[in-house]
């Protein structure tokens, strides 16, 4: 990915733990590496096709002078989020804030905090088989749209499916969607749980009826196995109510562990011969 860099931008601002730091202010030095596609601007010589580093420099300065944080960690985190939300062409950013006048009582050149943040692509399966199923799903998708760190990019049609497992229950309404998000996998899972709780989801019977079920199927190309989270979602290759919506919105997306596309996984599940 291409990069545009801003190095050693000096800003006088009021951040720090000690009262004199926020009252008197001091110098901060900011560097940013912005990951984007520069080819469109390179071919057209059109500034609107790129990220204007002059405007970004002023954005950084204004942000750090209008806001006050005790910690560099908080300043750099909030600044990175603001830039990613404000600049449509910015895909990822490495941001460094230095504090050369840090009051530590010892000779040093500088202290600094550097982070890398960016947009991630996630696929989420959704389902409901209690009450007004469509309303539960509609509300959940709108709930995702209302979160500033999430952009809902594509939503499948709702699919009526038979329940999975041995518990006798009503038919499901299922689907899948693709989002861009600034959230980590764990943070995204927490947000999904909040939406489930808002729909009065009760986790009583495994594979039992539920007002709303939201599962992370994929997060970039990552493979995650923790107590709380398994990505790609466990056993999704054996669930047509997951694969059919995924084939609708991302037929050529490849499962990072199985190395088969969504289309190939569905054909395999249905007993069809895969093309070599």
Regions found by a protein language model. Give the residues of each.
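Flexible, gly/pro- and Lys/Arg-enriched active-site loops
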Residues: 37-42, 119-121, 164-171, 189, ...
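Short loop/turn motifs enriched for small/polar and acidic residues
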Residues: 96-100, 158-160, 217-219
């Amino acid at each position: 990915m291409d990069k545009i860099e801003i190095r050693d931008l000096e800003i006088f601002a009021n951040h720090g733990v000690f009262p004199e730091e926020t009252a008197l202010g001091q110098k901060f030095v900011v560097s940013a590496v912005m990951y984007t596609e520069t080819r469109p601007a390179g071919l057209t010589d059109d500034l609107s096709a790129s990220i204007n580093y002059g405007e970004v420099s002023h954005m950084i300065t204004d942000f750090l002078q209008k806001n006050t944080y005790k910690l560099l960690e908080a300043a750099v985190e909030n600044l990175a989020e603001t830039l990613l939300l404000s600049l449509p062409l910015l895909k990822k950013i490495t941001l460094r804030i230095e504090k050369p006048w840090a009051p530590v009582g010892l000779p040093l050149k500088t202290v600094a905090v550097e982070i890398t943040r960016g947009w991630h692509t996630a696929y989420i399966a959704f389902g409901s088989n209690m009450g007004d199923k469509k309303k539960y799903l509609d509300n959940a998708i709108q709930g995702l749209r209302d979160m500033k760190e999430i952009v809902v990019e594509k939503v499948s049609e709702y699919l009526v499916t038979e329940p999975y497992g041995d518990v006798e229950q009503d038919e499901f309404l299922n689907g899948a969607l693709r989002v861009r998000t600034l959230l980590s996998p764990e943070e995204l899972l927490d947000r999904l749980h909040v939406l489930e709780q808002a729909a009065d989801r009760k986790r009583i019977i495994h594979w039992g009826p539920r007002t709303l079920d939201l599962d992370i199927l994929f997060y970039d190309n990552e493979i995650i196995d923790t107590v709380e989270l398994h990505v790609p979602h466990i056993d999704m290759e054996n669930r047509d109510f997951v694969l059919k919506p995924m084939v609708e919105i991302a037929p050529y997306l490849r499962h990072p562990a199985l190395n088969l596309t969504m289309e190939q996984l569905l054909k395999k599940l249905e007993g069809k011969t895969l093309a070599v």
